[in-house]
């Protein structure tokens, strides 16, 4: 009795093709790397910096130096996982009129010997159809 090898060969080719697919396409809701220059990532980063400054007890604003890494996850909306570097500025916080992101980014930095840099990890949850964005997690050191 002769058995055809065609179904086995076709199955092996299919298996190899599936293994070559990026892992994010195989796991619904999984994390996917994102470019730090992606407009959605930049918007989430701006929101994170604004919220960090609103929530922190620091007397001075911190501005974004750079986005180190970005990932996203499709949930009910999009969740952005950001690693960012922030730097303390010379702009003091004043009660009643908080600065917006663009104003903070224009703040001067202190002299090099007095500079304080933070590495922060933020999770930003965006649901545009509800016009709602939330900072769901924040840690800086």
Swiss-Prot record:
<feature type="domain" description="Cystatin">
    <location>
        <begin position="29"/>
        <end position="129"/>
    </location>
</feature>
<keyword id="KW-0964">Secreted</keyword>
<feature type="signal peptide">
    <location>
        <begin position="1"/>
        <end position="26"/>
    </location>
</feature>
<dbReference type="InterPro" id="IPR018073">
    <property type="entry name" value="Prot_inh_cystat_CS"/>
</dbReference>
<feature type="disulfide bond">
    <location>
        <begin position="120"/>
        <end position="140"/>
    </location>
</feature>
<comment type="similarity">
    <text>Belongs to the cystatin family.</text>
</comment>
<protein>
    <recommendedName>
        <fullName>Cystatin</fullName>
    </recommendedName>
</protein>
<feature type="short sequence motif" description="Secondary area of contact">
    <location>
        <begin position="73"/>
        <end position="77"/>
    </location>
</feature>
<dbReference type="InterPro" id="IPR000010">
    <property type="entry name" value="Cystatin_dom"/>
</dbReference>
<feature type="disulfide bond">
    <location>
        <begin position="91"/>
        <end position="107"/>
    </location>
</feature>
<keyword id="KW-0732">Signal</keyword>
<dbReference type="InterPro" id="IPR046350">
    <property type="entry name" value="Cystatin_sf"/>
</dbReference>
<keyword id="KW-0646">Protease inhibitor</keyword>
<comment type="function">
    <text>Inhibits various C1 cysteine proteases including cathepsin L, papain and cathepsin B. This protein has no toxic activity and its function in the venom is unknown. It may play a role as a housekeeping or regulatory protein.</text>
</comment>
<dbReference type="GO" id="GO:0070062">
    <property type="term" value="C:extracellular exosome"/>
</dbReference>
<dbReference type="GO" id="GO:0004869">
    <property type="term" value="F:cysteine-type endopeptidase inhibitor activity"/>
</dbReference>
<keyword id="KW-1015">Disulfide bond</keyword>
<keyword id="KW-0789">Thiol protease inhibitor</keyword>
<dbReference type="Pfam" id="PF00031">
    <property type="entry name" value="Cystatin"/>
</dbReference>
<feature type="site" description="Reactive site">
    <location>
        <position position="29"/>
    </location>
</feature>
């Amino acid at each position: 009795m002769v058995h055809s090898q065609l179904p086995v060969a076709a199955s092996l080719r299919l298996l190899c093709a599936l293994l070559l697919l990026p892992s994010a396409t195989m796991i619904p809701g999984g994390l996917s790397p994102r470019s730090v220059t992606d407009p959605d990532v930049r918007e989430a980063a701006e929101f994170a910096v604004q919220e960090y400054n609103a929530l922190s007890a620091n007397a001075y604003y911190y501005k974004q130096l750079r986005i180190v890494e970005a990932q996203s996850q499709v949930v009910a909306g999009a969740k952005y996982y950001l690693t960012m570097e922030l730097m303390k500025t010379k702009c003091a916080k004043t009660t009643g009129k908080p600065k917006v992101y663009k104003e903070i980014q224009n703040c001067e930095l202190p002299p090099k010997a007095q500079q304080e840099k933070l590495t922060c990890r933020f999770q930003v949850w965006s649901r545009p159809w509800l016009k709602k964005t939330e900072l769901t997690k924040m840690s800086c050191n």
